[in-house]
Amino acid sequence: MSKATCIMVQGTMSGAGKSLLCAALCRIFAQDGWRVAPFKSQNMALNSFVTRDGLEMGRAQVVQAQAAGVEPDVRMNPILLKPSSDIGSQVIVNGEVRGQMPAAEYFRRKKQLIPDILAAYNSLAEDFDIIVIEGAGSPAEINLKSEDIVNMGLAKLVDAPVLLVGDIDRGGVFAQLFGTVELLEPDERARIKGLIINKFRGDVGILRPGLAMLEEKTHLPVFGVVPYLKADIEDEDSLSDRLQVKNAVKPLDAAIVRLPHISNFTDFMPLEQHPLLGVRYVQTTRELGTPDCVILPGTKNTVDDLLWLRQCGLEAAISKLAQRGTPVLGVCGGYQMLGQTLADPEGAESGRPQTLRGLGLLPTQTTFAAEKRRTQSQATVTAAPFAGAHLTGYEIHTGRTTVQGAPFCTLADGTPEGSVQGQVFGTYLHGLFDSGELTEQFAAYLCRRKGIDPAAAAPISMQEYRTQQLDLLADGVRHNLDLAAVYAAMGLAQPAERGNDQ
Protein backbone atom coordinates (compact mmCIF):
# COMPACT_ATOMS: atom_id res chain seq x y z
CA MET A 1 0.00 0.00 0.00
CA SER A 2 1.42 3.41 -0.98
CA LYS A 3 2.02 5.99 1.72
CA ALA A 4 -0.26 9.03 1.94
CA THR A 5 0.68 12.46 0.71
CA CYS A 6 0.06 15.39 3.03
CA ILE A 7 -0.59 19.11 3.30
CA MET A 8 0.00 21.17 6.43
CA VAL A 9 -1.83 24.33 7.52
CA GLN A 10 0.11 26.70 9.75
CA GLY A 11 -1.07 30.07 10.99
CA THR A 12 0.36 33.45 11.82
CA MET A 13 -1.21 33.25 15.29
CA SER A 14 -3.68 31.34 17.39
CA GLY A 15 -7.19 31.86 16.06
CA ALA A 16 -6.14 32.45 12.45
CA GLY A 17 -8.56 29.72 11.36
CA LYS A 18 -6.28 26.69 11.03
CA SER A 19 -8.71 24.19 12.55
CA LEU A 20 -11.65 25.13 10.36
CA LEU A 21 -9.53 25.43 7.22
CA CYS A 22 -8.23 21.92 7.91
CA ALA A 23 -11.81 20.72 8.39
CA ALA A 24 -12.76 22.33 5.07
CA LEU A 25 -9.84 20.67 3.27
CA CYS A 26 -10.76 17.31 4.81
CA ARG A 27 -14.31 17.74 3.52
CA ILE A 28 -13.21 18.90 0.06
CA PHE A 29 -10.70 16.10 -0.45
CA ALA A 30 -13.27 13.54 0.74
CA GLN A 31 -15.84 15.00 -1.66
CA ASP A 32 -13.22 14.65 -4.39
CA GLY A 33 -12.96 10.93 -3.71
CA TRP A 34 -9.86 10.66 -1.53
CA ARG A 35 -9.47 8.78 1.74
CA VAL A 36 -8.59 11.59 4.13
CA ALA A 37 -7.46 11.82 7.75
CA PRO A 38 -6.63 14.86 9.90
CA PHE A 39 -3.54 15.02 12.09
CA LYS A 40 -2.29 17.32 14.82
CA SER A 41 0.76 16.12 16.73
CA GLN A 42 0.01 18.15 19.85
CA ASN A 43 -3.23 19.84 20.82
CA MET A 44 -3.98 21.91 23.90
CA ALA A 45 -7.67 21.95 24.70
CA LEU A 46 -10.22 21.67 27.47
CA ASN A 47 -12.71 19.96 25.18
CA SER A 48 -11.92 16.32 24.50
CA PHE A 49 -13.59 13.20 23.14
CA VAL A 50 -13.46 9.47 23.84
CA THR A 51 -13.01 7.15 20.87
CA ARG A 52 -14.68 3.79 20.40
CA ASP A 53 -11.52 2.25 21.91
CA GLY A 54 -11.90 4.32 25.08
CA LEU A 55 -9.00 6.65 24.24
CA GLU A 56 -9.01 10.42 24.65
CA MET A 57 -8.30 12.96 21.91
CA GLY A 58 -8.91 16.62 21.10
CA ARG A 59 -12.27 17.60 19.65
CA ALA A 60 -10.77 19.67 16.83
CA GLN A 61 -9.51 16.50 15.16
CA VAL A 62 -12.85 14.82 15.89
CA VAL A 63 -14.60 17.55 13.89
CA GLN A 64 -12.02 17.22 11.12
CA ALA A 65 -12.52 13.45 11.05
CA GLN A 66 -16.27 13.98 10.78
CA ALA A 67 -15.60 16.38 7.90
CA ALA A 68 -13.56 13.66 6.22
CA GLY A 69 -16.31 11.11 6.79
CA VAL A 70 -14.15 8.82 8.93
CA GLU A 71 -14.34 7.66 12.53
CA PRO A 72 -12.26 9.66 15.01
CA ASP A 73 -9.01 7.83 15.77
CA VAL A 74 -6.55 8.68 18.53
CA ARG A 75 -3.71 8.47 15.98
CA MET A 76 -5.05 11.77 14.61
CA ASN A 77 -4.01 13.55 17.84
CA PRO A 78 -1.29 11.58 19.64
CA ILE A 79 -0.56 14.27 22.25
CA LEU A 80 -3.30 16.14 24.10
CA LEU A 81 -2.58 18.71 26.80
CA LYS A 82 -5.48 19.55 29.12
CA PRO A 83 -4.68 22.60 31.28
CA SER A 84 -5.38 21.88 34.92
CA SER A 85 -3.87 25.08 36.33
CA ASP A 86 -2.27 28.30 35.11
CA ILE A 87 1.15 26.63 34.89
CA GLY A 88 0.48 22.95 34.30
CA SER A 89 -1.44 20.42 32.24
CA GLN A 90 -2.53 16.83 32.20
CA VAL A 91 -0.44 15.14 29.50
CA ILE A 92 -2.27 12.53 27.42
CA VAL A 93 -0.26 10.42 24.96
CA ASN A 94 -1.97 8.09 22.51
CA GLY A 95 -5.20 8.56 24.43
CA GLU A 96 -3.77 7.55 27.83
CA VAL A 97 -2.91 9.84 30.73
CA ARG A 98 0.85 10.13 31.33
CA GLY A 99 0.39 12.42 34.31
CA GLN A 100 0.35 16.06 35.39
CA MET A 101 3.29 18.18 34.25
CA PRO A 102 4.33 21.81 34.76
CA ALA A 103 4.69 23.71 31.50
CA ALA A 104 8.44 24.20 31.89
CA GLU A 105 9.02 20.49 32.45
CA TYR A 106 6.89 19.53 29.46
CA PHE A 107 8.80 22.00 27.28
CA ARG A 108 12.08 20.32 28.25
CA ARG A 109 10.79 16.79 27.71
CA LYS A 110 8.40 17.01 24.78
CA LYS A 111 10.92 15.98 22.13
CA GLN A 112 10.97 12.59 23.85
CA LEU A 113 7.48 12.16 22.39
CA ILE A 114 8.64 12.38 18.76
CA PRO A 115 8.64 8.56 18.38
CA ASP A 116 4.98 8.50 19.49
CA ILE A 117 4.14 11.27 17.03
CA LEU A 118 5.86 9.57 14.10
CA ALA A 119 4.38 6.17 14.92
CA ALA A 120 0.87 7.65 14.89
CA TYR A 121 1.47 9.62 11.70
CA ASN A 122 3.12 6.78 9.80
CA SER A 123 0.36 4.39 10.80
CA LEU A 124 -2.28 6.82 9.51
CA ALA A 125 -0.31 7.33 6.32
CA GLU A 126 -0.60 3.61 5.57
CA ASP A 127 -4.40 3.75 5.80
CA PHE A 128 -5.26 6.98 3.96
CA ASP A 129 -4.49 8.84 0.73
CA ILE A 130 -4.16 12.36 2.14
CA ILE A 131 -3.24 13.56 5.62
CA VAL A 132 -4.32 17.12 6.46
CA ILE A 133 -1.99 18.37 9.19
CA GLU A 134 -2.80 21.24 11.52
CA GLY A 135 -0.09 23.31 13.18
CA ALA A 136 -0.46 25.24 16.43
CA GLY A 137 -0.12 28.92 17.19
CA SER A 138 2.58 30.35 14.93
CA PRO A 139 5.72 28.75 13.42
CA ALA A 140 7.55 32.03 14.10
CA GLU A 141 7.54 31.80 17.90
CA ILE A 142 11.33 32.08 17.94
CA ASN A 143 11.56 31.44 21.69
CA LEU A 144 9.93 28.01 21.22
CA LYS A 145 11.38 26.86 17.90
CA SER A 146 14.23 24.81 19.34
CA GLU A 147 11.79 22.30 20.83
CA ASP A 148 9.07 22.52 18.16
CA ILE A 149 7.13 19.33 17.46
CA VAL A 150 3.94 20.80 16.01
CA ASN A 151 4.84 23.40 13.34
CA MET A 152 7.98 23.46 11.17
CA GLY A 153 9.59 20.86 13.41
CA LEU A 154 6.83 18.43 12.47
CA ALA A 155 6.81 19.57 8.82
CA LYS A 156 10.47 18.57 8.57
CA LEU A 157 9.86 15.21 10.22
CA VAL A 158 7.12 14.20 7.77
CA ASP A 159 8.30 16.29 4.78
CA ALA A 160 5.08 18.31 4.60
CA PRO A 161 4.35 21.19 2.23
CA VAL A 162 2.84 24.11 4.15
CA LEU A 163 0.03 26.60 3.61
CA LEU A 164 0.36 29.72 5.79
CA VAL A 165 -2.91 31.37 6.81
CA GLY A 166 -3.43 34.84 8.28
CA ASP A 167 -6.53 36.38 9.89
CA ILE A 168 -7.51 39.68 8.27
CA ASP A 169 -10.50 40.17 10.57
CA ARG A 170 -8.22 41.21 13.43
CA GLY A 171 -6.19 43.53 11.21
CA GLY A 172 -2.57 43.64 10.11
CA VAL A 173 -2.75 40.54 7.93
CA PHE A 174 0.01 41.66 5.55
CA ALA A 175 2.37 42.26 8.46
CA GLN A 176 1.31 38.92 9.96
CA LEU A 177 2.17 36.97 6.83
CA PHE A 178 5.29 38.90 5.85
CA GLY A 179 6.67 38.96 9.39
CA THR A 180 6.07 35.24 9.88
CA VAL A 181 7.84 34.37 6.64
CA GLU A 182 10.77 36.66 7.47
CA LEU A 183 11.31 35.05 10.88
CA LEU A 184 11.60 31.56 9.40
CA GLU A 185 14.85 29.88 8.42
CA PRO A 186 15.50 29.50 4.66
CA ASP A 187 14.70 25.77 4.68
CA GLU A 188 11.46 26.51 6.53
CA ARG A 189 10.43 29.21 4.07
CA ALA A 190 11.01 26.74 1.26
CA ARG A 191 8.30 24.52 2.74
CA ILE A 192 5.63 27.23 2.36
CA LYS A 193 3.87 26.72 -0.96
CA GLY A 194 1.21 29.40 -0.65
CA LEU A 195 -0.41 32.06 1.52
CA ILE A 196 -4.08 32.27 2.49
CA ILE A 197 -5.93 35.30 3.83
CA ASN A 198 -8.81 34.20 6.03
CA LYS A 199 -11.99 35.81 7.43
CA PHE A 200 -12.27 38.60 4.85
CA ARG A 201 -15.34 40.86 4.75
CA GLY A 202 -16.03 43.09 1.76
CA ASP A 203 -14.84 43.53 -1.83
CA VAL A 204 -11.75 41.44 -2.55
CA GLY A 205 -10.79 43.90 -5.28
CA ILE A 206 -9.67 46.33 -2.59
CA LEU A 207 -7.06 43.79 -1.50
CA ARG A 208 -5.50 43.12 -4.89
CA PRO A 209 -2.72 45.77 -4.75
CA GLY A 210 -1.73 44.48 -1.32
CA LEU A 211 -1.80 40.87 -2.50
CA ALA A 212 0.53 41.71 -5.39
CA MET A 213 2.95 43.48 -3.06
CA LEU A 214 2.81 40.61 -0.57
CA GLU A 215 3.65 38.11 -3.30
CA GLU A 216 6.53 40.31 -4.46
CA LYS A 217 8.00 40.69 -0.98
CA THR A 218 7.60 37.07 0.15
CA HIS A 219 8.18 35.42 -3.26
CA LEU A 220 5.16 33.26 -2.44
CA PRO A 221 1.80 33.03 -4.22
CA VAL A 222 -1.48 33.88 -2.52
CA PHE A 223 -3.66 30.79 -2.94
CA GLY A 224 -6.87 32.52 -1.95
CA VAL A 225 -8.86 35.01 0.09
CA VAL A 226 -11.43 33.11 2.14
CA PRO A 227 -14.43 35.17 3.31
CA TYR A 228 -15.69 35.30 6.87
CA LEU A 229 -17.86 32.19 6.70
CA LYS A 230 -20.90 31.84 8.95
CA ALA A 231 -20.61 28.06 9.29
CA ASP A 232 -21.38 27.10 12.89
CA ILE A 233 -18.69 24.54 13.62
CA GLU A 234 -17.01 24.03 16.95
CA ASP A 235 -13.35 24.95 17.32
CA GLU A 236 -11.43 26.08 20.37
CA ASP A 237 -11.52 29.76 19.43
CA SER A 238 -15.20 30.01 18.50
CA LEU A 239 -16.05 28.02 21.60
CA SER A 240 -14.23 30.59 23.70
CA ASP A 241 -16.37 33.26 22.04
CA ARG A 242 -19.46 31.33 23.11
CA LEU A 243 -18.43 31.70 26.73
CA GLN A 244 -18.80 35.47 26.40
CA VAL A 245 -22.58 35.23 25.86
CA LYS A 246 -24.25 36.87 28.88
CA ASN A 247 -27.83 37.48 27.75
CA ALA A 248 -30.56 35.07 26.71
CA VAL A 249 -32.45 36.32 23.65
CA LYS A 250 -34.95 33.46 23.37
CA PRO A 251 -38.06 32.60 25.41
CA LEU A 252 -36.25 30.12 27.66
CA ASP A 253 -33.26 31.18 29.75
CA ALA A 254 -30.61 28.50 30.39
CA ALA A 255 -27.74 29.72 32.58
CA ILE A 256 -24.53 27.69 32.38
CA VAL A 257 -21.98 28.42 35.09
CA ARG A 258 -18.67 29.42 33.53
CA LEU A 259 -16.35 27.56 35.87
CA PRO A 260 -12.68 28.65 35.91
CA HIS A 261 -11.61 25.25 34.54
CA ILE A 262 -14.72 24.58 32.43
CA SER A 263 -14.32 21.70 29.98
CA ASN A 264 -16.35 19.92 27.31
CA PHE A 265 -18.80 22.77 26.99
CA THR A 266 -19.39 21.46 23.48
CA ASP A 267 -22.05 19.42 25.32
CA PHE A 268 -24.37 22.42 25.13
CA MET A 269 -24.09 23.36 21.46
CA PRO A 270 -27.36 21.48 20.68
CA LEU A 271 -29.14 23.65 23.25
CA GLU A 272 -27.77 26.77 21.58
CA GLN A 273 -29.27 25.68 18.25
CA HIS A 274 -32.74 25.20 19.72
CA PRO A 275 -35.24 27.88 18.60
CA LEU A 276 -36.57 28.42 22.13
CA LEU A 277 -33.47 28.02 24.30
CA GLY A 278 -31.34 31.04 25.09
CA VAL A 279 -28.02 29.77 26.44
CA ARG A 280 -25.73 32.11 28.36
CA TYR A 281 -22.61 31.67 30.51
CA VAL A 282 -22.46 33.27 33.95
CA GLN A 283 -19.71 33.95 36.49
CA THR A 284 -21.44 36.02 39.17
CA THR A 285 -24.64 35.90 41.19
CA ARG A 286 -25.79 39.06 39.42
CA GLU A 287 -25.33 37.44 36.02
CA LEU A 288 -27.08 34.29 37.23
CA GLY A 289 -30.32 36.07 38.12
CA THR A 290 -33.44 33.89 37.96
CA PRO A 291 -33.05 31.64 34.92
CA ASP A 292 -35.40 28.88 33.84
CA CYS A 293 -32.67 26.32 34.52
CA VAL A 294 -29.09 26.19 35.78
CA ILE A 295 -26.39 23.94 34.34
CA LEU A 296 -23.12 23.06 36.05
CA PRO A 297 -20.79 21.83 33.27
CA GLY A 298 -17.72 19.65 33.28
CA THR A 299 -14.45 20.92 34.70
CA LYS A 300 -10.79 19.96 34.60
CA ASN A 301 -10.51 20.64 38.33
CA THR A 302 -13.66 19.83 40.27
CA VAL A 303 -12.25 20.64 43.71
CA ASP A 304 -10.84 24.07 42.83
CA ASP A 305 -13.97 25.01 40.91
CA LEU A 306 -16.23 23.93 43.77
CA LEU A 307 -14.25 26.16 46.13
CA TRP A 308 -14.56 29.02 43.62
CA LEU A 309 -18.31 28.42 43.37
CA ARG A 310 -18.52 28.65 47.15
CA GLN A 311 -16.36 31.75 47.51
CA CYS A 312 -18.09 33.81 44.81
CA GLY A 313 -21.56 33.14 46.20
CA LEU A 314 -22.85 31.09 43.28
CA GLU A 315 -23.19 27.96 45.44
CA ALA A 316 -25.67 29.70 47.75
CA ALA A 317 -27.51 31.29 44.83
CA ILE A 318 -27.88 27.98 42.99
CA SER A 319 -29.06 26.26 46.17
CA LYS A 320 -31.74 28.92 46.67
CA LEU A 321 -32.93 28.52 43.09
CA ALA A 322 -33.09 24.75 43.53
CA GLN A 323 -35.11 25.14 46.73
CA ARG A 324 -37.61 27.24 44.76
CA GLY A 325 -37.94 24.47 42.19
CA THR A 326 -35.65 25.76 39.43
CA PRO A 327 -34.26 22.77 37.51
CA VAL A 328 -30.52 22.22 37.98
CA LEU A 329 -28.44 19.90 35.79
CA GLY A 330 -24.87 18.83 36.51
CA VAL A 331 -22.66 17.12 33.94
CA CYS A 332 -19.49 15.23 34.94
CA GLY A 333 -17.62 17.55 37.33
CA GLY A 334 -20.79 19.58 37.74
CA TYR A 335 -22.61 16.38 38.72
CA GLN A 336 -19.95 15.63 41.32
CA MET A 337 -20.35 19.11 42.84
CA LEU A 338 -24.11 18.63 43.30
CA GLY A 339 -23.57 15.70 45.68
CA GLN A 340 -23.10 15.46 49.44
CA THR A 341 -19.34 14.90 49.66
CA LEU A 342 -16.27 14.85 47.42
CA ALA A 343 -13.38 12.85 48.88
CA ASP A 344 -9.85 13.03 47.51
CA PRO A 345 -7.94 10.66 49.82
CA GLU A 346 -4.86 10.43 47.58
CA GLY A 347 -4.83 14.00 46.32
CA ALA A 348 -5.55 12.75 42.80
CA GLU A 349 -7.78 15.71 41.95
CA SER A 350 -6.53 18.52 44.15
CA GLY A 351 -2.91 17.62 44.85
CA ARG A 352 -3.48 16.95 48.56
CA PRO A 353 -5.75 14.62 50.56
CA GLN A 354 -9.01 16.29 51.57
CA THR A 355 -12.76 15.86 51.74
CA LEU A 356 -15.17 18.62 50.77
CA ARG A 357 -18.89 18.97 51.14
CA GLY A 358 -20.79 19.39 47.91
CA LEU A 359 -23.86 21.49 47.25
CA GLY A 360 -25.95 18.74 48.85
CA LEU A 361 -28.60 18.78 46.13
CA LEU A 362 -28.13 15.12 45.13
CA PRO A 363 -27.79 12.02 47.36
CA THR A 364 -24.32 11.11 46.08
CA GLN A 365 -20.78 10.69 47.38
CA THR A 366 -17.78 10.96 45.06
CA THR A 367 -14.29 9.59 45.68
CA PHE A 368 -11.43 10.65 43.40
CA ALA A 369 -8.70 8.25 42.29
CA ALA A 370 -5.84 8.40 39.81
CA GLU A 371 -7.44 6.03 37.31
CA LYS A 372 -9.55 7.75 34.66
CA ARG A 373 -12.74 6.22 33.26
CA ARG A 374 -13.01 6.68 29.48
CA THR A 375 -15.82 5.00 27.58
CA GLN A 376 -18.53 5.60 25.02
CA SER A 377 -22.04 4.85 26.26
CA GLN A 378 -25.62 4.49 25.11
CA ALA A 379 -28.38 5.10 27.60
CA THR A 380 -32.09 5.56 28.12
CA VAL A 381 -33.17 8.31 30.49
CA THR A 382 -35.32 7.06 33.37
CA ALA A 383 -35.69 10.36 35.24
CA ALA A 384 -39.03 12.08 34.86
CA PRO A 385 -39.81 14.23 32.94
CA PHE A 386 -37.28 13.02 30.34
CA ALA A 387 -38.05 9.30 30.70
CA GLY A 388 -37.61 7.32 27.51
CA ALA A 389 -35.19 9.68 25.79
CA HIS A 390 -32.34 7.76 24.17
CA LEU A 391 -28.88 9.26 24.15
CA THR A 392 -25.36 8.42 23.09
CA GLY A 393 -22.48 9.96 25.00
CA TYR A 394 -19.11 9.35 26.55
CA GLU A 395 -17.48 9.49 29.96
CA ILE A 396 -14.13 11.08 30.89
CA HIS A 397 -13.63 11.35 34.64
CA THR A 398 -11.52 10.19 37.57
CA GLY A 399 -14.15 10.19 40.31
CA ARG A 400 -16.32 7.24 41.30
CA THR A 401 -19.77 8.21 42.54
CA THR A 402 -22.10 6.19 44.74
CA VAL A 403 -25.79 7.04 44.56
CA GLN A 404 -28.51 6.67 47.14
CA GLY A 405 -31.76 7.00 45.24
CA ALA A 406 -33.00 7.09 41.67
CA PRO A 407 -30.61 7.20 38.69
CA PHE A 408 -30.77 9.70 35.85
CA CYS A 409 -30.57 7.01 33.18
CA THR A 410 -29.83 3.35 32.49
CA LEU A 411 -26.88 2.33 30.33
CA ALA A 412 -27.28 -0.19 27.52
CA ASP A 413 -25.92 -2.97 29.76
CA GLY A 414 -28.53 -2.22 32.44
CA THR A 415 -26.22 -0.28 34.75
CA PRO A 416 -27.88 2.71 36.46
CA GLU A 417 -26.07 5.99 35.84
CA GLY A 418 -26.35 9.44 37.33
CA SER A 419 -28.77 10.72 39.93
CA VAL A 420 -32.03 12.64 40.24
CA GLN A 421 -33.72 14.23 43.22
CA GLY A 422 -36.73 16.44 42.59
CA GLN A 423 -35.77 18.95 39.89
CA VAL A 424 -32.02 18.35 40.27
CA PHE A 425 -30.34 16.01 37.77
CA GLY A 426 -26.79 14.74 37.42
CA THR A 427 -24.94 12.56 34.91
CA TYR A 428 -21.40 11.71 33.84
CA LEU A 429 -22.40 11.50 30.16
CA HIS A 430 -20.89 14.11 27.87
CA GLY A 431 -22.64 14.61 24.54
CA LEU A 432 -25.99 13.87 26.18
CA PHE A 433 -27.87 16.38 24.01
CA ASP A 434 -26.32 15.39 20.66
CA SER A 435 -28.94 12.85 19.62
CA GLY A 436 -31.76 15.38 19.86
CA GLU A 437 -34.23 13.35 21.94
CA LEU A 438 -33.11 14.71 25.29
CA THR A 439 -32.84 18.23 23.84
CA GLU A 440 -36.45 17.99 22.69
CA GLN A 441 -37.73 16.73 26.03
CA PHE A 442 -35.58 19.15 28.02
CA ALA A 443 -36.94 22.14 26.06
CA ALA A 444 -40.53 20.86 26.23
CA TYR A 445 -40.19 20.42 30.01
CA LEU A 446 -38.99 24.00 30.45
CA CYS A 447 -41.76 25.22 28.12
CA ARG A 448 -44.46 23.56 30.20
CA ARG A 449 -43.04 25.06 33.39
CA LYS A 450 -43.15 28.52 31.83
CA GLY A 451 -46.50 28.16 30.08
CA ILE A 452 -45.05 28.16 26.56
CA ASP A 453 -46.46 25.91 23.85
CA PRO A 454 -43.86 23.13 23.52
CA ALA A 455 -44.98 22.38 19.95
CA ALA A 456 -42.25 24.72 18.72
CA ALA A 457 -39.65 22.69 20.60
CA ALA A 458 -38.63 20.58 17.61
CA PRO A 459 -35.89 17.96 18.03
CA ILE A 460 -32.42 18.97 16.88
CA SER A 461 -30.11 16.36 15.38
CA MET A 462 -26.56 17.55 15.88
CA GLN A 463 -25.37 15.06 13.28
CA GLU A 464 -27.59 16.55 10.57
CA TYR A 465 -26.81 20.10 11.65
CA ARG A 466 -23.07 19.42 11.72
CA THR A 467 -23.20 17.86 8.24
CA GLN A 468 -24.98 20.93 6.86
CA GLN A 469 -22.47 23.27 8.45
CA LEU A 470 -19.47 21.27 7.23
CA ASP A 471 -20.84 21.35 3.69
CA LEU A 472 -21.37 25.10 4.00
CA LEU A 473 -17.78 25.52 5.18
CA ALA A 474 -16.35 23.34 2.41
CA ASP A 475 -18.34 25.16 -0.28
CA GLY A 476 -17.11 28.53 0.95
CA VAL A 477 -13.48 27.43 0.90
CA ARG A 478 -13.79 25.57 -2.42
CA HIS A 479 -15.10 28.69 -4.15
CA ASN A 480 -12.35 30.96 -2.81
CA LEU A 481 -9.21 28.82 -2.76
CA ASP A 482 -7.00 27.83 -5.70
CA LEU A 483 -7.46 24.11 -5.20
CA ALA A 484 -5.42 23.27 -8.28
CA ALA A 485 -2.46 24.95 -6.58
CA VAL A 486 -3.17 23.11 -3.32
CA TYR A 487 -3.26 19.77 -5.14
CA ALA A 488 -0.06 20.68 -7.01
CA ALA A 489 1.65 21.44 -3.68
CA MET A 490 0.88 17.84 -2.68
CA GLY A 491 2.09 16.48 -6.02
CA LEU A 492 -1.44 15.53 -7.07
CA ALA A 493 -3.68 16.52 -9.95
CA GLN A 494 -7.01 18.08 -9.07
CA PRO A 495 -9.88 15.71 -9.90
CA ALA A 496 -11.53 17.02 -13.05
CA GLU A 497 -15.09 16.11 -12.11
CA ARG A 498 -15.32 18.66 -9.27
CA GLY A 499 -13.14 21.41 -10.64
CA ASN A 500 -12.65 24.77 -8.97
CA ASP A 501 -15.25 27.51 -9.09
CA GLN A 502 -12.91 30.32 -8.08
Give the predicted meaning of each segment:
Residues M1-A322, P327, D344-G347, A370-E371, ...:
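Flexible phosphate-sensing "switch/lid" loops adjacent to ATP/NTP-binding sites
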Residues G330, G334:
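Gly/Ala-rich beta-loop-alpha elbow adjacent to hydrolase catalytic centers
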Residues M337:
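Conserved catalytic-site region of short-chain dehydrogenase/reductase
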Residues A348-T375:
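Conserved P-loop NTPase catalytic core
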